[in-house]
Amino acid sequence: MVLRKTYHFSWRDYTLEFGRQTCIMGVVNVTPDSFSDGGRFYDHHAAAAQGEKLVAEGAAIIDIGGESTRPFSEPVTVEEEIRRVVPVIEKLAQRVSVPISIDTTKAAVARRALEAGASIINDVSALRFDPGLAVLAAEFDTPLILMHMLGDPKSMQVL
């Protein structure tokens, strides 16, 4: 008999249990050029509906992104990224009970997303693009997921 360890990760009003079953993060990219969905959820209403669908299908976290990180993608301004993600997060925060993460490399975007109802920061640059995300995570007492990316979207395929 193999004993499995389980871990409980709690913050704010959320608790995730790791070790008993797979914890799925559903991803909704609110971009016109997403490599995973081809921009199908660029509309705020379609994006929120997709988030709800992912929760109904078993997602334990919903990740909302407003800037593509596909190879050779162009960066977007803070204002544009906020315009894309905040309305979706506001809608989902009222409709789902799972944590919502904001996929961003910018502290200004993360701040607005957290104020709108997100409760996790997911940074694909691992703080290389904006170390202020760590300070913001501490200020909001919220988890910070650090991802790995070689270079940036414009250069990661040639490094």
Indicate residue ranges for each PLM-predicted region.
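Conserved anion-binding
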Residues: P32-S34, T69-F72, A116, V124-L159
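N-terminal amphipathic alpha-helix/helix-capping segment at the start of soluble metabolic enzymes
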Residues: M1-N29
